[in-house]
From Swiss-Prot:
Keywords: Carbon dioxide fixation, Lyase, Magnesium. This is Phosphoenolpyruvate carboxylase. The lineage of its organism: Bacteria, Pseudomonadati, Pseudomonadota, Betaproteobacteria, Burkholderiales. One of its GO terms (biological process) is tricarboxylic acid cycle. The active site is at H182, K627. Its EC number is 4.1.1.31. Forms oxaloacetate, a four-carbon dicarboxylic acid source for the tricarboxylic acid cycle. Its cofactor is Mg(2+). It comes from Bordetella bronchiseptica (strain ATCC BAA-588 / NCTC 13252 / RB50). PROSITE patterns: PEPCASE_1, PEPCASE_2. It is an enzyme of class 4 (lyase). The keyword Magnesium applies. HAMAP family: PEPcase_type1 (MF_00595). It catalyses: oxaloacetate + phosphate = phosphoenolpyruvate + hydrogencarbonate.
Amino acid sequence: MAAYNAPVSNCQFRLTHILPIPQRQGAPTDPFQMNAIRQQSDSAEPLRHDIRLLGRCLGEVIQACEGKRVYDTIETLRRTAVRFRRAGDPADDKLLQARVKQLRGNDPNSVARAFSYFLHLSNIAEDRDQNRRQRDRALAGAGPERGSLRQAIESLKAQGVNNARIRRLLSEACVMPVLTAHPTEVQRKSTLDVHREISSLLVQRERELTADELSELDLALIGQVATLWQTRMLRYTRLTVADEIENALSYYRSTFLNVIPRVYGDLARLLNREPVKPFTPPPPPLEPFLRMGSWIGGDRDGNPNVDAATLERALLRQATVLFEHYLQEVHALGAELSASTLLIEADPALLALADAGGDDSPHRRDEPYRRALIGIYARLAATARHLTGQELARRATVPAAPYDTPDALAADLAVIAASLSAHHGAPIARLRLSGLQQAVTVFGFHLATVDLRQSSDVHERVLAELFARAGDGIDGQAVDYLALDEAARVAVLRRELAHARPLASPWIAYSEETASELAVLRAAAAGRARYGRQAVLQSIVSHTETLSDLLEVLVLQKEAGLIAPPGETIAPGDGLMVVPLFETIPDLQRGPEIMAAWLDLPEVRQRVRLAQGDTQEVMLGYSDSNKDGGFLTSNWSLYQAERALVDVFSARSVRLRMFHGRGGSVGRGGGSSYDAILAQPPGTVAGQLRLTEQGEVIQSKYKDAEVGRWHLELLVAATLESSLAPQAAATSAEDAHMQQHAPAMSFMSELAQRTYRGLVYDTPGFADYFFAATPISEIAGLNIGSRPASRKKGQHIEDLRAIPWGFSWAQCRLMLTGWYGMGSAIEAYLETGAQGAPRSRRARLAQLREMASDWPAFRTLLSNMEMVLAKSDLAIAAGYAQLVPRRGLRERVFGAITAEHGRTLAMLRLLTRRELLADNPGLMASLRERFAYIDPLNYLQIELIKRHRAAQRRAGDDADIRVPRAIHLTINGIAAGLRNSG
């Protein structure tokens, strides 16, 4: 196949030479950027080779499976798209669109699959190349890479931070990525499994191979690509919560269970004062600071499919996967630890553990480690039976009592480790035992902490019903909860918390909503009792607007038996931490005031001190604040809220833990996690960090074990650097930035919000434009998540969830959520200034340039916006605008978008004094190549949406089911090409 057998320059995405920048009619002459933290390689040849190889495999598979005619059709489109992106001739662009419009029958599906899978395969190759370059860098003896643990530790030590301070921070730290099931993950688990196999084969090909071995691997590679081609890319039914649980658990098997202990091991070695010697005893496991969290099975906000049963299932399936791993590791240890007492001594404690193991085989009489591990295996199997109700052991076991706690398992493993270390077995312990010991401290018996989340208005309705059905209140008066003002609600809730009598009755039949909420909380209590308190720790309150929104959750916990009754001692870990989620711009502005009132309540302060270790978590929502106020206002409001929260918590001597509700797209807080953490206001990290990993970001970061290891390392390194770098200087510099630049930011934020809301909320007919000019309706039918795309039926922007909102703008290549309003804001500040601003335009420009170069918060903001603008394409977006039937509406809205896009580009160039990505020419060339494979998918999507909607208007439904399926295929491919669109 010429397309996929072509010379490497025809199919690779990341080139070392620079290609001419294509020019579109009506579009800026700018390159495009992908989201990644990557150093430029000295040689792109290995990547070129891998993409050429995978392209050749795909071409061979397509020709064999679909025939030469389809193959030639795909190749013609590919050549036309590449030629346009390289030469920039508008005639090629028109020819590409014309050829796409001619596709009929099943050809649109074949074309969509071909380009989509080529982008999937290129992503696999790029991920593999990242691993390769990091390894090559280490082999070359280069300095530590920015973002690595080694670089972080060396940097801190150079600033006078010693190991003791680092260890002290780690002993109290919390770094927790939280996997969520938001509907932007468009890949099936079946295809992800094949991706992993292809990546593994690429790794194997890097070894020195004989001709026969190489031929065998290449045949296997074609086999996997053929499997990919013959595997259905789309789901025919909507994902259930159970499906989402299993999808998430696949990343534990492939990545987290093995990689997280390795990250701990890497850090322990870096903190070791002396070089590790083979027979030096390995250090004991580090205190657990890096753990995993999950919303899957516990996030009820707007998802009627999540209830007590899904929470129970999530906890059960997590424990099942974990015990399968433990049993597998202990079984493997039994094979490894074959030391004989005829040859080497063993500790008395180890001998006692072996004797207690129940193995009386004469063949292992002199092998105490194996006998001890047989007993541990039996106890683990018994524990799994007790907790999961399943027989997970893959071998016969002796009768044994289950472990009561993970600490008991850890103690037995410590006995083995101590005996090995004392008798020349330290290098043996490092093979597997040390990693298992660390895993037990991290994962316990629960694997990951499942958060509960529900909207505050649901809590209000539940409490209102409980009060109404209870009759007279504590003071003898009936409580009409919904009719009370805020002060009265707070008073009623505090009285209820102080009273021991239950509010709910087991003899009353409550509404489905109330019964469900109480059942979830009771399931959480049961899960904590079964799997340990770490199984469920937080109850997040979406749409927190008032103090009563938080108190309501405490009252409901009292009803479910989660917190100690009034008058009883509050033990550490008692109950669930109530976590406010501030999402909209007004909520972010009120957040610090609400938290001050919360922490000033004596009963709450006591709970924070005794149950929560003087730690209180606050979650900030990036998605809804962006949808509410636009890119700049969202970011500035978040930044101000964080600074104000630091002051509130510092004044009350409470540790603040920020939980960042970030997504993949920049409009939802995406971008470099490392840079984002370092750009946080001083004092907001302090060893405490939770952040969501959502949608396609999960597979992008964690599908591959080595890539996953790097991303986890970035999170830990950034947390260490942000927390331990000298704070006085950082705080002083930040205060200076705020004093000098906050008025400018506030002025621009207000103007940007006015511009954004003027378009989205104040333009008549904008909702009609959005639903016509984006594939939002088609995305809703993609079966990519269990949660509905809208909170309510109908076409209202206010009811649309922030995630499909941003995903839709990415599909049509506008990425509006990541830049709209910025151009007008910067231009207005330059022209008129704010109160206290420099008097001249030149001086104001100098100020903004200083902010862009010296202030991390503003620099990161502009960097993320540049990434989004680089991926935008107004010429393609114009094609989507043509889907809007009302010409006047189309011209009014798209005209405003086009004008603001040009204005924003001009302002960014003015501030940075360069073209987009001019400081990264290698990436510029790479993106031109990649977009040559996304363009045909966009044009095909536009054409298919036209056909689909026309058929719906004619017949009320689409007679040809292939059309909507092909649309869904293009959505999949575009998302794969953009990589961070959700």
